[in-house]
Design a protein with these regions (language model features):
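Glycan-association/targeting regions that enable binding to alpha-glucans and other polysaccharides
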Residues: 2-154, 158-159
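Conserved, mostly hydrophobic/aromatic
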Residues: 52, 160, 223, 233, ...
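C-terminal beta-strand-rich structural cap/linker in extracellular carbohydrate-active enzymes
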Residues: 56, 649-668
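Beta-strand-rich binding/interaction modules
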Residues: 59-70, 102-104, 622-645
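Substrate-binding/active-site clefts of carbohydrate-active enzymes
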Residues: 161-230, 236-363, 384-390, 407
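Aromatic/acidic polysaccharide-binding cleft in carbohydrate-active enzymes
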Residues: 163, 411-412, 425, 468-501, ...
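Active-site-proximal helices and loops of the catalytic beta/alpha 8
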Residues: 267-276, 284-285, 290-301, 356, ...
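Carbohydrate-binding surface patches
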Residues: 583-632
Length: 668
């Protein structure tokens, strides 16, 4: 859900556009190493060199680099001389020792006019400068001590809604009906989820299929064979609904899923297979049917803030008029908001020695994915990260942030999650959205390459390489439907259970999904598989994107493609930690180049020299792409993941890509 745009960073004086730009042109491009070095975010204590090209024979009287964030500094730019008949100016600045976002623009006096070069108006803070623009270029300055766990950049993640993944043999999960709750238990594993609408328009989400932690444990060999190394569970704690984003008790695994011992056993066996487990933390709200609120009286007459204003949990919530008028999440009365800055709540969730976040990491999990992270106060996030890292420096904190996380605007405030003090990384919805737009011909390759390059510019490498690169999720229609161009959004919600793709739609959707898959497994960050996507599951929006895994009924071609892409990534370290550059050879072909050069990877760690190029062609026609040997670290031979050999002729490669096909090539 989009809820804001980054600020312009125009502290101080605003300058009006002048009319003298036809003869006076300034140029600066943040993605050009000649204009900005180093590229990307900069650690505290670092230096940045910024250059400006003046395309006019008459040099300006004065030329300044203006930098600000709260305070403002103006740096005179010194002339370096002519390059290709154009005057080059330069300023070198220290970024200081404070993690923050810096904003900058260029200004000069010309023929009595004040001339400004600012950022393009796409709110990225990156790209080619625009004369007269009031937008600011962004420079991210992050804590030099900031690091993220290596397993995040190396991993392949798999997201599981436990109720919909697998019924464990030898368990009686279907017998664990909720006390006093009207729930529906599906006997047929392959049925569609039910849509049971309440008066407020919400789905009751009270139908269950009986998937449990034991079922996940029994499928660990399958997940290992798929190439997975990180398991991310949607919430598993006690809750009334099947999705469990309405927590009832943070200290208990929902009995329909198992218990604490079942989770510990799963974590231990997963670890033995080289897999980690991450939990979903829902800390901005609880369920109304919780120990802490108890609106329905499940826990007794005088337990919980709704039942007793003297309850120890009363201060967790904001009552406008007790008991029925209270703040709730996005208007849902079933989800009372908590006051995250309440001292008792902070101690319970974060600070006590056996707090919620500490307890479950000690029990063998490897960290947390935070639901609606952009709705949590920044001090809360900082303390959460500190507490998790105190238990295990190798544990991770991922956040649900839907936009560029370096300058997210939420509730009127600009928040940066990339400075090293809050999150390790976030869900990469911008990548997902950009690739969908490209594959559906809504944006051309150049626009998408620019978007992805801007993200890479704004994010510190530890953050960028730890991104959760998702294709599907529980909050979106199945990716197969999206890429088939038929996600059911144009039909009534009550009819979506019966919605099916046609044979032709399924074929085109599968081809596009395989292109997206290839690209996702070729870029920095953890590629994430939403359970069932690898099996060809289709479905409209919630609850139909939350169907059960089709054991024994998988789309074997799709499954084989997922396995192949995971094996490719796991077998080539350059796809995990190599430097990254996005390319757009033509409007219909998007590419990414990964490199290890001079015996080092993107983090400066020892690595074998390597180069990989991935190209995906969204058009139905064959396209020929030309690459120079210089593009691929001087290589003269490229070998694709399916065994094709490409040889340079005259210092260039000619690569034919069939319609709706892709290729990944490795330098030899």
């Amino acid at each position: 859900m989009e809820r804001g745009k980054p600020p312009r960073g125009t502290a101080g004086q605003n300058f009006e556009k002048t009319e003298c730009f036809e003869s006076m042109v300034l140029k600066h491009h943040t993605l050009n190493p000649f204009d900005r070095k180093p590229q990307g975010a900069v650690a505290t204590g670092g230096q940045v060199r910024l250059r400006l090209t003046v395309e006019d024979e008459q040099a300006p009287v004065e030329l300044f680099l203006r930098v600000w964030n709260g305070d403002e500094r103006r740096y005179p730019m010194r002339p370096l001389g002519l390059k290709d008949g154009r005057m080059i100016y330069e300023a070198q600045i220290g970024v200081g020792d404070k993690p923050r976002l810096l904003w900058y623009r260029f200004e000069c006096e010309y023929k009595g006019e004040h001339v400004v070069l600012g950022a393009p108006g796409d709110h990225t803070g990156c790209g080619e400068g625009v004369m007269g623009s009031e937008e600011s270029f962004q420079l991210t300055v992050y804590d030099a001590a900031y690091d993220t766990p290596a397993w995040m950049r190396d991993g392949v993640m798999y997201q599981i809604m436990v109720d919909r993944f697998c019924r464990g043999e030898g368990t009686d999960a279907l017998m664990h009906a909720k006390d006093g709750q009207n729930i529906i238990l599906h006997e047929d594993w392959n049925e569609m989820p039910f849509l049971n609408i309440a008066e407020n328009g919400d789905n009751f989400a009270n139908d269950f299929f009986g998937g449990n932690l034991e079922g996940v444990r029994q499928k660990l060999p399958y997940l290992k064979q798929l190439g997975v190394s990180v398991l991310y569970f949607n919430p598993i704690f006690c809750a009334r609904t099947n999705h469990k984003y309405d927590t009832s008790d943070y200290r208990k695994v929902d009995p329909m899923f198992g218990d604490e011992q079942a989770l510990a056993r799963l974590c231990k066996e997963a670890e033995a297979l080289g897999m980690r487990v991450m939990l979903d933390g829902v800390f901005s709200h609880v369920g109304d049917d919780s120990l802490y609120f108890n609106r329905r009286g499940t826990y007794g007459e005088h337990v919980g803030a709704y039942r007793d204003p003297d309850s120890p949990y009363y201060k967790w919530f904001t009552f406008r008029r007790w008991p029925d008028d209270y703040e709730c999440w996005w208007g849902f009365k079933t989800l009372p908001n908590v006051n995250e800055m309440d001292e008792d709540y902070r101690r319970f969730i974060l600070e006590d020695d056996d707090s919620v976040v500490r307890h479950w990491v000690r029990k063998g999990t490897s960290g947390w994915r935070l639901d609606v992270a952009d709705e949590l106060p920044m001090p809360f996030l900082r303390e959460l990260r500190r507490q998790v890292k105190d238990v295990s420096k190798d544990a991770a904190v991922l956040g649900e942030v839907w936009e560029d996380a370096s300058h997210k605007v939420a509730y009127g405030q600009m928040r940066s999650y990339v400075l090293g003090d809050t999150l390790d990384s976030v869900m990469n919805y911008p990548l997902r959205d950009a690739l969908i737009a490209f594959l559906m011909a809504q944006k051309d390759a150049a626009a998408v390459a620019k978007e992805l390059s801007s993200l890479a510019q704004n994010y510190p490498k530890p953050f960028l390489y730890a991104l959760m690169n998702l294709m599907g999720s529980h909050d979106r229609p199945r990716i197969l439907n999206v890429l088939a161009g038929n996600d059911g959004s144009d039909i009534p919600r009550s009819q979506r259970a019966d919605h099916r793709l046609s044979r032709e739609e399924r074929m085109i959707g599968a081809l596009r999904e395989q292109l997206m898959l290839r690209f996702m497994f070729s870029v920095p960050g953890m590629p994430c598989i939403y359970y069932g996507d690898e099996a060809g599951v289709e479905g409209c929006a919630d609850p139909f994107c939350r169907r059960t895994y089709p054991w024994g009924r998988e789309d074997q071609d799709m499954l084989a493609r997922y396995k192949a892409m995971a094996a490719m990534r796991n077998g080539h370290p350059v796809l995990k930690t190599g430097e990254c550059a996005y390319i757009a050879p033509c409007s219909a072909v998007l590419g990414v180049i990964r490199k290890n050069e001079n015996g080092k990877d993107a983090f400066g760690k020892k690595a074998e020299n390597a180069c990989a190029v991935t190209l995906i062609n969204r058009s139905a026609r064959e396209v020929v792409v030309y690459l120079t040997s210089a593009d691929v670290s001087g290589a003269q031979t490229l070998v694709s993941d399916d065994g094709q050999i490409f040889t340079a002729r005259g210092g260039a490669f000619s690569v034919k890509i069939k319609g709706l096909q892709g290729v990944t090539m490795f330098a030899m």
